[in-house]
Amino acid sequence: MTSEQIRQTWLNFFKDKGHIIEPSASLIPVDDPTLLWINAGVAPLKKYFDGTETPKSKRITNIQKSIRTNDIDNVGKTARHHTFFEMMGNFSIGDYFKKEAIEFGFELLTSPKYFDIPLDKLYMTYYPTDVEAKNTWLKLGVKEDHLIPVEGNFWEIGAGPSGPDTEIFFDRGTSYDLRGPELIRDDIENERFIEIWNIVFSQYNADPKLKRSEYKELPNKNIDTGAGLERFACVLQGTKTNFETDLHYPVILKVESLSGVKYDGQMAFKVISDHIKTLVFAISDGANLSNEGRGYVLRRILRRAVKYGKSIGFDAPFLHLLVDTVVDMMSNFYTNLIETAVIVKKIILKEEEKFFSTILDGEKHLLQSIKDGKLSGEDAFKLYDTYGFPIELTIEYAEEHGITVDIKGFNEALEVQKSRSRDARKVTHSMKGQDEALLNFDVPSEFVGYDYLQTESKVIKVFDQGIVLDKTPFYANSGGQISDTGSINGLVVRDVIKLPHGQHLHLIETDAFTEGDEVLCIVNQDKRHHTMKNHTATHLLNQALKDTLGSHVKQQGSYNGDLKLTFDINHYETIKDEEILTVEKIVQQKIKEQIDVVTHVLPIDEAKKLGAAMQFGEKYGDIVRVVDVGSWSMEFCGGTHVKNTSDIKNFMITSVESIGSGTYRFEAITGQVLSQVKKIVQNLLDMIHQHIEKIKSLDENHNLKPLPELTGSYQDIINLRLYNQYISNESKVVEKQLEAKLIDQIILQADTFIPKTIEPTTYIYSDNLPQSSLKPLIDVLYDKIKADTVVLLNISEDKASYLVKSSVNEARNVINELNKVLDGRGGGKPDFAQGGTQALDKVQMFLKGKN
């Protein structure tokens, strides 16, 4: 059975059992700071399990692309570890539970209509006190000796939904290991029993303060399952490891062809096959390679693959040559890979070239830095910072040469270098506790805010936090757009949020309301209209970025408020000022063209046929809302928009910044932008005026270029940035000119420093002279005095400086003596040396001794 057949068999089976098919989410999590990557099938569905949102069906099935890197060192060493994998799942949110979930699993695995796995090849584990799970398996015909109680069969991560689980193992026979089911019971690493499916019965609300036996039952019991496609393929295709299945072997054959090395189970082939899939899928979803967060993870993966490639003869970039093989192998199911293939190859090749250019020097430095069988933390950090070696790669190299690495020292060096600090987000998938009252409230409420900003409504529910109305004109915070504010019966509506079943909860003083009250709702019109301008402008910006930077650009997040908009995108190169200006001009042109903004409500399949773009991280029902700007920009969107692009008035990009891992944030304003610009650039103007005041205080006649006028374009930001550089340089020029004049004046007065008595070693004292004048002064004094050695000691408010010039090679000796006496530091050559000290009390004692 091919992997494609396995996928379709899984999805069709659960579809026939009343499940809706949820498309795979992006590998990049949306609004979830606990995750670096989507790492399980349940991860994108957490909001359904904790009750934050209600799904359109209580039965869901999916095949979710996932990345986990905690076991990266095992990739290639074992038969089944991967960084990229596909997790097949079926989920019940408050619908069927334990008995049905087990029955579904049994039927799918053993029925000749589906996977047709012999029952005697399967072993099941269960939580020791979960009698219901055990008895359900027994009733289905599983033998007692194929059921194994395991204390660890309880899924729990912190507070929130938790419960027992049952795991299903496939027995590959004694040719893999003579030992039997004790391998499962005692959790011994082995190649005989392969875990293919885990079914979690989420029935308790975990509380760290309570014993497990005291956990309360969840108001909605859930089923969460995960089955690795790669493991299923290994079992059903009868291969020795996952890497000989059709999910990896085409890549291995391509590596054979490129390297000229025959595959015979070598770890290098497996690592390369796994890692290139991770890179292709992650970059296709908008991730980039960098030195922080998920970008650092990808860079480490690429460089690890290159390192193993070198071990089979690759001495030039090769990973980019494998991209087409991955696309051919996977694009039947993941069609977006075809669209992104070209840009993925470019990004991988660019990173490979960068690494290959430093890798030889890095390896040489590593071997040269080894002392007494150990690599210091400082050298390990240099390999990371200068040569681009991830510490994990350095450790692998070191282990191959029998060397230890000072990890503690490396971490200390990394901490010091603040600019390289990486995001230390913990990768978990903990869930919030369920709110029973909100979960159970399913009375419908209508949003009428597309057409009305004032309505008479009825209160249908009062919660502690706020009230729900039968109909409301107030937009709730969603889709990147802030909520409306305004009033209900004269009381201020602070915020509006969506409840699990989609109703709008108005955050307001609730004591004034009871259920059944008739109320008057008034939305703040100014705020709504400004928000609408910004939201429509965001759609224009999105399309302008694709037109300018390339079709690979994907939205990574957005904020549409009344005062500004922000828009996050992925891009693999630094965005140039000229590109930003081009994007801005495109949006401004679309505003001038006075294009009607039309909203369509239609079936999702029709919307897709029209080419409408889905918004980042959003889930859609069967009927969707599409916002169409003259067929130039067409997006799925539930937000509020202007009727015509001319309503936006104007558009200005105010900043573009990198926010890490190849992600850029655009910030912009709309409306009467010229009146807002000065406030936005005030910090830059303040810096410029400080420089101007400084220059005028030093030289009031110094000519300066005029300050550029503000025009209401990103060009203002560029002009002021350049002017700030110019004025900063002018300030330094004026300072140097004045300093040169001051030194000239000091030199003209050199005779006033000469003491009456000239000795072989003559000491000269001065107060508060500029540091830059001391060397020219001692040169002049030395020529005038003709002593063997001249010492110039200058005392300022917080330190003393001393310079020594000698024709008898005594300068270094004198400096060393002064350093001892004055508790100072310094050095130099026999004919000239200098030093300094902050111990002014010792300087005063020294002067008294000289007098």
From Swiss-Prot:
Q: Which reaction does it catalyse?
A: tRNA(Ala) + L-alanine + ATP = L-alanyl-tRNA(Ala) + AMP + diphosphate
**Locations listed in the record:** Cytoplasm
For this UniProt entry, which segments traverse the membrane? none
Q: Which PROSITE patterns match?
A: AA_TRNA_LIGASE_II_ALA (PS50860)
Any one Pfam family here would be DHHA1
EC number(s) per entry? 6.1.1.7
Give the cofactors, semicolon-separated. Zn(2+)
Signal peptide (residue range): none
SMART domains this protein is in? tRNA_SAD
Q: What job does this protein perform?
A: Catalyzes the attachment of alanine to tRNA(Ala) in a two-step reaction: alanine is first activated by ATP to form Ala-AMP and then transferred to the acceptor end of tRNA(Ala). Also edits incorrectly charged Ser-tRNA(Ala) and Gly-tRNA(Ala) via its editing domain.
Free-text domain note: Consists of three domains; the N-terminal catalytic domain, the editing domain and the C-terminal C-Ala domain. The editing domain removes incorrectly charged amino acids, while the C-Ala domain, along with tRNA(Ala), serves as a bridge to cooperatively bring together the editing and aminoacylation centers thus stimulating deacylation of misacylated tRNAs.
Name the family the entry cites.
Belongs to the class-II aminoacyl-tRNA synthetase family.
Query: What protein name does the entry list?
Result: Alanine--tRNA ligase
Q: Which organism is it from?
A: Acholeplasma laidlawii (strain PG-8A)
Name of encoding gene: alaS
